[in-house]
Amino acid sequence: LYRVVDPALEDADAFQTASVLAAALRKIDFDLVVCGEGSADRYSQQVGLLVGALLGLPVVNATGSVRAEGDALLVERVLENEVEVLEIAPPAVVSMTSDAVLPRIPQLKDILAAGKKPVTTWSLDEVGGIPESPVETVSVKAPASIARKGIVLEGATDENIGELVSGIRASR
């Protein structure tokens, strides 16, 4: 386990986060970098893609599964009407979908073993610092809520369908 810890990372944007991760990854040997599809990057789904770009590696977004096949990695993505299977050479970066892996409940021996694993912690200075952000966040706002009538029609009866169509026409 490797981690970079610094209070300056609390407000890092996707580019800054990816830059720090890429710098840390350059310090170690790896075959595969697995990222979530989005989280602290305001769910913009950019960090994994940026890490791959900064490292010059193949990167696949929205991955459902990854498995080793000889010297290659087989990466599956569920598209609208099909499953896409890509063969890529490691090292590579993948961003997994949130439903790709169901979390399991660890057994006590797994928890105890995890506590004994080595953890390498670096400061920002040890990985080259944090770059200036090319983006300035002016504000983050939620969309304005719209008052709705809240009409619920139960069942697909001819009467309900007629009422729905009449309601739509009346609101125009």
Stretches with model-predicted labels:
Residues 1-172:
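N-terminal glycine-rich FAD/FM-binding segment characteristic of electron-transfer flavoproteins
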